[in-house]
Amino acid sequence: MSIREKLLMKKIVKREKMKKELSQKKGNKNAQKQEPPKQNGNKPSKKPEKLSKKHVAKDEDDDLEEDFQEAPLPKKKQQKQPPKKQQIQVANSDSESDDDEQEDEADEDSDLDEVAEVDEEDVDSGSEDDDQQEDEDEEEPVPAKKTKLLPNKSKAQNGKPAKDDEPFTVESSLAALDYRDSDDRSFASLKGAVSEATLRAIKEMGFTEMTEIQSKSLTPLLKGRDLVGAAQTGSGKTLAFLIPAVELINKLRFMPRNGTGVIIISPTRELSMQTFGVLKELMAHHHHTYGLVMGGSNRQVESEKLGKGINILVATPGRLLDHLQNSPDFLYKNLQCLIIDEVDRILEIGFEEELKQIINLLPKRRQTMLFSATQTARIEALSKLALKSEPIYVGVHDNQDTATVDGLEQGYIVCPSEKRLLVLFTFLKKNRKKKVMVFFSSCMSVKYHHELFNYIDLPVTSIHGKQKQTKRTTTFFQFCNAESGILLCTDVAARGLDIPQVDWIVQYDPPDDPREYIHRVGRTARGSGTSGHALLLMRPEELGFLRYLKAAKVPLNEFEFSWQKIADIQLQLEKLIAKNYFLNQSAKEAFKSYVRAYDSHQLKQIFNVNTLDLQAVAKSFGFLVPPVVDLKVGAAKRERPEKRVGGGGFGFYKKMNEGSASKQRHFKQVNRDQAKKFMR
């Protein structure tokens, strides 16, 4: 029997008892006066009623009389009182009473605790003494109905809350959690704080113990705190923010009609797909909706799915801003949590302006999480903009001696420019049965080496930013599922990607800075108890970079390499490039892009383009005479527009309009009406 029914039964018994006592008193008076008894018609006493501080609303009294019509209740004079302020909108007024009364009695008490920020006077504690209740002739206060954190459908139009409705807020139901680094790091210790459906999914994924970043961040995140997390690559940051996101949506009972409650921003398409894959496994036993939007996908299909309602959304920055500005059916006003993964990478690739616009468009009352492998001044500035409350900082490896994981064996070899390709070919030929990733500095360099190695019977695959999205996706999953293989890639694959069992990371072209080096080598030795190897090729003039790596806590040893065992294919390479027109054109573009990328290095005192021997560099691309490179053209192409607003190609046309007046005539933006007139 529920609390409400118990209170009603007490009320009925008390009133029947009062009626009997009243009839006995009248009978005694009639016997003394020897007058015939009068029919009182079951009228209640005219004793003035006392008005309780905690009153019952008129609509709830009507519900009580409908449920218990067989027990006649005395008519009471209702006194109008202003309704209590409530910060939560009740969902679906059409079925609010029927659905609530059919739920289990055991869930009644726990559900009352899960209601967020209801005024204290609206809920009766039920702890008043029975004697005090019998002495006072007043209505018993009925506990407030269970309310759901859903928009009021009767007061909303087109899925948008009415103006009079206050935005619903989140009060964590995990008040019993204490922020502490518990010795028990098993996921089973989260029982009671995390739903059974989530724990079952984690177990099916094969995880039993939490990593350090997970054990330190899960408790405050489950309590609704803002957090800035810094940990090494492969330390389990993805689950650290996905578990609280899923639990938040589950606690609030989000439905598709409520729109998007959690947004997760990732820097690249591959990382977005990987995060979405982990989320899919974690949501195996939940009924909430989840989706992925990213550049290269069909925007119209994404917009239609957003209109139907996606509770947890994984997105890249540019496409997310496009939907926020141009998809009218995208309901994000009920957003409860914003998660930004690999923040430093997002800022490095030029999406700082997009992030600021996204943060300004989203609701201010939300939980925010920022995760990255490194912390910089730009991240701190973004944290002040995105995090309104005092965030918790969790730096897992701040006090460690090394910035890379323990199972990683890393080193370098000093190689002159003309021998670089021969060393790489020999190394890949020897390790072709292992899983190897090779990093280049430009897309054209990846494209050329991919064509060259496959032409000379060394099977390799490639991922770079100029590929179509379908090709990138197919290659990524093929390499993930393969037991061995060679992947040539740019830094698009250097952040966050969890590719299993990578044996070697080869950095053919030097990274921009130590942070980029850390992210590249983080693709191997991921997880506890795993091992991996990393190799960095350096010119003799670049040895000063080791000082920066040492300052960044990156231990590097020089690897021994037998120069007598290098495959001497230089003559065959030069003949092939001279005869094959397509390889020749690809090699020219790769050479130019390599020199331009070298010129754009941040550490110019180490990577100085003036120290490059272009004749020796050209030999590594198969040329006897180096092609002409215009560094000014490269610099102009590397410039980004001052401000990317997202959608409509604004940044593209703004860049094209810079220059002569003739160009402005050709690339001037026009609206739809002007475009129609022009077409006529």
UniProtKB/Swiss-Prot annotation:
Biased segments, Polar residues type: 29-42
EC number(s) per entry: 3.6.4.13
Subcellular location: Nucleus, Nucleolus
Residues the entry annotates as binding ATP: 231-238
Catalyses which reaction(s): ATP + H2O = ADP + phosphate + H(+)
Top-rank taxon: Eukaryota
Chief location: nucleus
Motif segment (DEVD box): 341-344
Biased segments, Acidic residues type: 59-69, 95-141
PROSITE patterns, alphabetized: HELICASE_ATP_BIND_1, HELICASE_CTER, Q_MOTIF
Compositionally biased region (Basic and acidic residues): 670-680
Endpoints of the signal sequence: none
GO cellular component: nucleolus
Keyword ATP-binding: yes
Domain Helicase C-terminal: from-to ranges: 407-577
SUPFAM superfamilies recorded: P-loop containing nucleoside triphosphate hydrolases
Compositional bias annotation for Basic residues: 74-83
Every Helicase ATP-binding domain range: 218-393
The entry's keywords: ATP-binding, Helicase, Hydrolase, Nucleotide-binding, Nucleus, RNA-binding
Region annotated Disordered, chain positions: 1-168, 659-680
PANTHER family in alphabetical order: RNA HELICASE
Main function: Probable RNA-dependent helicase. Functions in cell growth and proliferation. May have a role in ribosome biogenesis and, consequently, in protein biosynthesis.
Other information: Mutation in the pit gene produce larvae that cannot grow beyond the first instar larval stage although they can live as long as 7-10 days. All the tissues are equally affected and the perfectly shaped larvae are indistinguishable from first instar wild-type animals. 'Pitchoune' means 'small' in Provence (Southern part of France).
Annotated protein name in UniProt: Probable ATP-dependent RNA helicase pitchoune
Source organism per UniProt: Drosophila melanogaster
Record lineage: Eukaryota, Metazoa, Ecdysozoa, Arthropoda, Hexapoda
